[in-house]
Amino acid sequence: GCRIDGNRFRDALFAIYLQKSEGCVVRGNDIRAAGREETRNGNGVHLWYSPGTRVIDNTIRGQRDGIYFEFSRGSVATGNVSEGNRRYGLHFMFSDSCRYERNTFRANGAGVAVMYSRHVVMDGNGFLDAVGSGAYGLLLKEITDGALVRNRFEGNSTGLLLEGASRLDIRDNDFRRNGWAVRLMASAEDSPFTGNVFEANAFDVSTNSRTLNSDFAGNWWDAYRGYDLDRDGSGDVPFRPVRFFALV
């Protein structure tokens, strides 16, 4: 595969575009655009039918989408900073068995969207400052059999939105200072939340369904007012995070 390493790109329509290129490495590049309107701007790192690509330690600002994966199975994004892009910091579709780890996605127009994929692992990322009615720290749509662990969601209008997502392991994440920390659509199911921290959010959990189809156990809630008489580390009274106003 190819190697694109340590370059500087300024005001390119598409800075790095890989099409049907297998096993490439895109590392340590500095990509910046002036932030033109979305329809006149392309993506920073764009993968199309490029399996096994590694996107590592790049900085991307002001593009349409910072990083775009489509039909690129088995690829990895690690240690990138994608911020201030017009649409998504990461836009990811139809790419099974991928990992993205230790990336920072900050102040992107619509946040991050991961869609229509299986076996995706999201570990140790920061989803920060996605603000607006259509902005999400992370949108997971039609994602199955994946993991969302050790991530930070902070300062977003909505931290995490799950729509049509199932069989996800959602564990040890921090949700702080979001409008809605987690929004679960009725189509999201069988995705247990364990060991997560919910602090200083306007609303911790909301849903458009009468029942939650995913379990919450062993999480920390700043709004919990119960007690732990047996001192086993878990509250003796269940916490119910969904409030009426979270549904409005």
Predicted features, each with a name:
Residues R3-V26, Y100-S117, N178, V182-A188, ...:
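Generic detector of contiguous secondary-structure segments
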Residues G1, R10-L18, E38-W48, G62-Y68, ...:
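Extracellular beta-strand/beta-solenoid scaffold signature
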Residues R3, F127, V131-G137, E154-G155, ...:
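Functionally critical loop-and-helix segments that line ligand-binding/catalytic clefts
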Residues A113, R150-N151:
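Short, conserved, surface-exposed binding loops centered on an aromatic residue
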Residues R8, E22, D30, P51, ...:
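Short, flexible active-site-adjacent loop segments at beta-strand->alpha-helix junctions, enriched
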